[in-house]
Regions:
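Secondary-structure junction/capping motif
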Residues: 70-76
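Conserved acidic-Pro-Pro-aromatic motif
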Residues: 2-8, 17-21, 76-201
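SAM cofactor-binding core of SAM-dependent methyltransferases
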Residues: 1-70, 83, 117-119
Length: 201
């Protein structure tokens, strides 16, 4: 839907990031090091990046934090200020746990929430408490195979999709799907098998 605009907040990807990446690949080529074709084709990713954020869509080089202290930081409260009916996607490498309470407070503005939970074996209770507040309802889950599994063969990182039950009707029936779902879920790392999820009552 071209009427939907995307605003991305990411302090790790800027011009310096791309320059550093290209320099590293060029040096590897000059030294005749093995370089995968995908790495060589990364230059097209940069072109796609420029095109994607050319019209309407925005990339703001800011770090998402609980409380703003620096110019390059922004809180969820400020991100959602004057916003409504949004899809919020969060992948901030472990900092998601710091902002869960703010997300719950602003839940009425959010239609759909997609969030990647890192180190879930260390933060299980935080995730459980977030779910128990019932502001959002889980509609999908996928194990991220890039981070691997723990000793119980469970993923260390999961991607969860929530819907706002105040805005959409949801079924009370339990899902009978096997996860990952064929045709819907895709591997984060192609060379590794995807992680089959086990559920317990």
């Amino acid at each position: 839907n071209q009427k939907c605009k995307i605003i991305a907040y990411d302090h790790t990807v800027d011009k310096k990031f791309w320059v550093k990446r290209f320099k590293k690949d060029i040096i590897s080529l000059l030294l005749f090091k093995k370089l995968r074709l995908t790495k060589i084709l990364d230059i097209f990713k940069y072109i796609n990046y420029l095109i994607f954020f050319k019209d309407g869509n925005k990339h703001l080089i800011k770090k998402i934090v609980k409380h703003e202290r620096k110019k390059n930081e922004i809180s969820i409260n400020n991100i959602l200020k004057n916003q409504n009916n949004i899809i919020l996607k969060i992948d901030i490498e472990g900092d998601e746990y710091k902002i869960l309470e703010q997300i719950n407070k602003e839940f009425i503005k959010i239609n759909l929430l997609i969030i990647e939970f890192h180190n879930i074996h260390k933060n299980f209770n935080k995730i459980l408490n977030f779910i128990k507040k019932r502001k959002f309802k889980i509609i999908h889950i996928h194990g991220n195979n890039y981070a691997g599994i723990n000793k119980h063969n469970d993923p260390k990182v999961v991607e969860m999709t929530f819907i706002n039950p105040k805005k959409f009707k949801t079924s009370k029936n339990k899902s009978n799907f096997n996860y990952p779902i064929i045709g819907l879920d895709y591997k984060n790392l192609k060379r590794r098998p995807d992680i089959k999820l086990k559920f317990h009552e």
